[in-house]
């Protein structure tokens, strides 16, 4: 940790620094962020890109009185360090340590909890409205990236904020990944006068004077407005924001602290909503991240000198899915693939490379992705929509109304289902079985390993209705891949026979359950272990047989217990009047914390050792 950073405990300490020290602070922050991220993993490139921006914001604004809201939160590392969490930052993303995202219960400087994209402007507007209703005085600032602006929610909020004309500042962090940078001397000149506080006041005074000219005054003003608007449409990149009712300032250099301090100070003088457009470089200050900002967006542990990962990457469920889809689409031209701004994260990068004309990245627009897929399915295509479980929640209405109500053959590849690890509660995919299971016409499949994933994808592509196929983040199990095979819908698979009780489950934990059951054999306890494979429809014939045994039944899943797979088993037994004792194991009715996947699974009793102990305890009581 550098000597200047050592002197910084809270944002007020930043205001005491000289301009040269502010730039040195930026360098020290980058070094500290790189060091910690190399040891803990994290969202490195986004945070490196906003170091100077973060310093400028905390120099100008008076947090926590002033509210600074970071959209998504990938870029909030410097913010955390500068707001009293400097020493704790070494615990970033570790179990019991600092979250990788802003959290209200972690610090008063985290004005709003985030993790999902495009929410900051809505939250900021809500705070501004609350401020004004209560007669309070403080600034509200939303910091949103150009990528997050592809989300429809952001534009809904911009539209409403522009209409209400409340005092609000939106900082658009343009890291050159989506919005093209405006160029030209005249553009720079127009930007300079737009950031001058004299411009707004002087323009109004000039118009008032011209209007007083007899006969031609009002006409001159109208002509001037048309000419001005014509130039702005051609040359000013903020025209969209102006039309929505915002004052636009920029673009400015997001790595020039002095310039940003000046512009943020000016932004505070406006009575209505303001957009400040800053240009930053994702990964700034670390060669490997600058060269490959997408690859260093989210990283595991890596060597600082080379940028190479500490652990060699293992084959993941995502990779198996992506490559299998490429194989299966080879002779099926009707298969198309859709992602919501996550081509690499969902494994669809392989599909995009092989079939670019059949690949669609819609941006951060999950609702649009699902309904677009529905339209494609109406016209004979076979859309595969690959979205993380936690983000699929955003398109719930579209899944129901546009896909399942019409029984359209859309395949939902639900990635990152279950516990995801260090990204924590905003990213755990623990609700999808519950919110998808209630929807009529939808078939739900859950593979326990990568071979079953391939078979289920094959089955889904051949099914005539909508299918959700959920699988976890991280390394696959390591089983041998066998030929593709059509699975009969709603059939389970018995993995082990036993006489003392039945374990039935789905997904990753079933592998641990099988090992736990095998361990119990050494103690004379014999369990049947069943892979349900389908959460909807269930294998009702097999459940009837299980119920007739009058032995304890234990369900296992990596989903919240409420409304999940175990609940489906309970409902069927209740409907059929089967009095078998059932115990449901899964995620408790709470938001799991962040940490390694194994740590979180252990917390909820879903590891091999914990399941072994739990099975033994349950059987001793029932």
From Swiss-Prot:
UniProt GO BP: 1-deoxy-D-xylulose 5-phosphate biosynthetic process; isopentenyl diphosphate biosynthetic process, methylerythritol 4-phosphate pathway; terpenoid biosynthetic process; thiamine biosynthetic process
Family matches, as SMART domains: Transket_pyr (SM00861)
Keywords, comma-separated and alphabetical: Isoprene biosynthesis, Magnesium, Metal-binding, Thiamine biosynthesis, Thiamine pyrophosphate, Transferase
Top EC class for this record: transferase
Gene3D superfamilies per the UniProt record, alphabetical: 3.40.50.920, 3.40.50.970
Cofactors demanded by this protein: Mg(2+); thiamine diphosphate
PANTHER family (alphabetical): 1-D-DEOXYXYLULOSE 5-PHOSPHATE SYNTHASE-RELATED, 1-DEOXY-D-XYLULOSE-5-PHOSPHATE SYNTHASE, CHLOROPLASTIC
Purpose: Catalyzes the acyloin condensation reaction between C atoms 2 and 3 of pyruvate and glyceraldehyde 3-phosphate to yield 1-deoxy-D-xylulose-5-phosphate (DXP).
Family (UniProt): Belongs to the transketolase family. DXPS subfamily.
Protein name according to UniProt: 1-deoxy-D-xylulose-5-phosphate synthase
Name of the coding gene: dxs
């Amino acid at each position: 940790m550098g000597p200047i950073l050592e002197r910084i405990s809270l944002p007020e300490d930043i205001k005491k620094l000289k301009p040269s020290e502010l730039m040195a602070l930026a360098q020290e922050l980058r070094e500290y962020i790189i060091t910690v991220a190399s040891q803990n993993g994290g969202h490195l490139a986004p945070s490196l890109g906003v170091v100077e921006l973060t310093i400028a914001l905390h120099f100008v604004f008076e947090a926590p009185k002033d509210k600074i809201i970071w959209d998504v939160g990938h870029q909030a590392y410097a913010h955390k360090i500068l707001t009293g969490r400097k020493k704790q930052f070494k615990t970033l993303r570790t179990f019991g340590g600092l979250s990788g995202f802003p959290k209200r219960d972690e610090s008063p400087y985290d004005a709003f909890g985030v993790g999902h994209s495009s929410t900051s402007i809505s939250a900021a507007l809500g705070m501004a409205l609350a401020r004004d209703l209560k007669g309070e005085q403080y600034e509200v600032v939303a910091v949103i990236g150009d990528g997050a602006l592809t989300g429809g929610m952001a534009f809904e909020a911009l539209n409403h904020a522009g209409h209400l004309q409340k005092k609000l500042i939106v900082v658009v962090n343009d890291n050159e990944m989506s919005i093209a940078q405006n160029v030209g001397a005249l553009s720079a000149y127009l930007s300079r006068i737009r950031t001058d506080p004299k411009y707004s006041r002087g323009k109004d005074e000039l118009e008032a004077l011209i209007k007083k000219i007899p006969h031609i005054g009002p006409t001159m003003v109208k002509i001037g407005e048309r000419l001005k608007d014509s130039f702005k449409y051609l040359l000013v990149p903020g025209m969209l924001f102006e039309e929505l009712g915002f004052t636009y300032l920029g673009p400015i250099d997001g790595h020039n602290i002095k310039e940003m301090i000046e512009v943020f100070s000016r932004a505070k003088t406006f009575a209505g909503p303001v957009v400040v457009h800053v240009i930053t470089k994702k990964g700034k200050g670390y060669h490997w991240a600058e060269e490959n900002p997408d690859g260093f967006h989210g990283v595991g542990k890596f060597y600082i000198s080379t940028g190479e990962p500490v652990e060699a990457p293992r084959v993941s469920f995502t990779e198996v899915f992506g490559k299998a889809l490429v194989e299966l689409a080879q002779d099926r031209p009707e298969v198309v693939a859709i992602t919501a701004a996550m081509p690499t994260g969902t494994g669809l990068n392989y599909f995009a490379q092989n079939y670019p004309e059949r690949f669609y990245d819609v941006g951060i627009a999950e609702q649009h992705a699902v309904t677009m897929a529905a339209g494609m399915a109406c016209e004979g295509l076979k859309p595969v929509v690959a979205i993380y479980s936690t983000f699929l929640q955003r398109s719930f209405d579209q899944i129901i109304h546009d896909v399942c109500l019409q029984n359209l053959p859309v395949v939902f590849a639900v990635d990152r289902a279950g516990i995801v690890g260090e990204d924590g509660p905003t990213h755990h995919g623990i609700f999808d079985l519950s919110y998808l299971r209630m929807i009529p016409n939808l078939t739900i499949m859950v593979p326990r390993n990568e071979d079953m994933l391939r078979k289920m994808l094959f089955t889904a592509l051949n099914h005539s209705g909508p299918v959700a196929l959920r699988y976890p983040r991280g390394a696959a199990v390591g089983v041998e891949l066998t030929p593709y095979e059509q699975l009969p819908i709603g059939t389970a698979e018995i993995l082990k026979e036993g006489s003392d009780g039945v374990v039935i489950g789905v997904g990753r934990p079933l592998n641990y359950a099988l090992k736990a059951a095998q361990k119990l054999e050494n103690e004379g306890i014999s369990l049947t272990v069943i892979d349900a494979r389908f959460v909807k429809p269930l294998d009702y014939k097999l459940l009837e047989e299980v119920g007739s045994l009058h032995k304890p039944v234990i369900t296992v899943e990596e989903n919240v217990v409420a409304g999940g797979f175990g609940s489906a088993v309970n409902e069927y037994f209740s409907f059929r009047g089967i009095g078998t004792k059932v115990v449901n194991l899964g995620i408790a009715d709470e938001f799991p914390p962040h940490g390694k996947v194994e740590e979180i699974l252990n917390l909820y009793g879903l590891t091999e050792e914990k399941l072994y102990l739990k099975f033994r305890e349950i059987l001793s009581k029932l």
